[in-house]
Amino acid sequence: MKYLVLALDAMGGDFGPKVTVPASLEALSLHPKLKLLLVGDPDVIKPILDGFNVKYLRRLTLIPSKSVVNDNDRPAQAIRLSKNTSMRIALELIKSGHAQACVSAGNTGALMGLSKLVIKLINGIDRPALTALLPHQKQGKTVILDLGANILCNDSMLVQFAIMGSVLSEQIAGIVNPRVALLNIGSEETKGLDNIRCASKILHTIPSIHYIGYIEANDLLMGKTDVLVCDGFAGNITLKTMEGMMRLILSLLTTSEEKNKLYYFIRKIKMWMNKCVFKQFVQLNPDLYNGAYLVGLRSTVIKSHGGANKHAFTKAITQAMYAVERRIPEKIADRLNTMMLYKK
């Protein structure tokens, strides 16, 4: 049997091994062809592994690390002090050929910087972008990028994001000729910042991209586009606002606290909402789509939410598997070469 091998930064995130280790075992139980290289402090990880099914432990290898990248470290500082950290070792396992992808819930800036340093960028890509597939009203998925890797983006970067997002939509969501839109404050061509308007003009000239113009944030979940492109500042705020709202709605719809002042009204809402509608709300649970692709790199790197629980981190591991199986980095490189946009 040919295994798919992933390297996991076991020490990253708000909860570290308390979440990443149980999630690793859950992923191994779900995917028989998966092997995991768990990078972290053996003294912390081994006690957590005690009691788990030995059958799954056979497909898990513990790779020791001496330190961890702190969440509050600035990217430059984190990179400078990254030697022997769980994050860097996990990335170097890809470089050495021992792993096919990496998953980390650690410091986003450090992960991007170290990935560029260790994994390298695809020719023709200036900066990697954090990318996620979000469910929408029409029961499909919208690829949205960038979600926070790049606060400022020029028009060239936005065009590159559009190309990468199109490939991801085709390969992961299975959409033929995906629609691409730019996130903006209005649908009129005159709206928005200069970089957005310039990117729009360029996208209109690329026949292989199905560019449909601007989309406003209130249409994100309406299924009006398959790929939504924006800078990391707008994307991160949009995503977190949506996730916060959905967590609030889901918590209200699933509350069982009789003393809650809203309980009576919530119960009435539950009775009014049919099962189909309720299921659509449940599908928007952020835990179900945890794991952002750091696209633009020569290998797959997945960034999990720092506060992810066990099931959410398991989802991030699954996302990494999908990307490896569908050869996303290779497909992006092929698309860039075909479009003659690579840098010489």
From Swiss-Prot:
Its main location: cytoplasm. GO terms for cellular component: cytoplasm. One of its GO terms (biological process) is phospholipid biosynthetic process. NCBIfam families: plsX (TIGR00182). Homodimer. Probably interacts with PlsY. Catalyzes the reversible formation of acyl-phosphate (acyl-PO(4)) from acyl-[acyl-carrier-protein] (acyl-ACP). This enzyme utilizes acyl-ACP as fatty acyl donor, but not acyl-CoA. This is Phosphate acyltransferase. The gene is plsX.
